Amino acid sequence: MKIKVIHTSDLHGYFFPTDYLDRERKATGYLSLLNNIKKDDFTILTDGGDTLQGSSFAYYVKEFLGSDIIADLMQNVDYYTLGNHDFNYGYNYLKSYVENMKGKLLCANVTDKTSGIEISPYAVKEM
């Protein structure tokens, strides 16, 4: 059995294959990567955080749409953690993102005693 672990990190809101300046399509962005991944039962997709802030798209989503849009874009992630920039837009925005994520949140150095959101320090996956 071969297991594939695909890890992303520091997306900083760059989901679409563009730099948002010249509007030309580029071989970048999270969605461009997903188009090239063949995910199966032996593929684990993880993300290391710093997802919510950093691009003009991320700022637009924060101002006008809400973090559930970004959670929808990240729906294929099995396990994720939070980076320091994920806290930039405040507790309620981050909480909404976490509540809408399908993957499991892993953080050994974060607790939330008010919301009841499950935050695990690690995970064991049996295959």
Name each model feature, range by range:
Residues 1-127:
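Acidic, metal/ion-coordinating pockets
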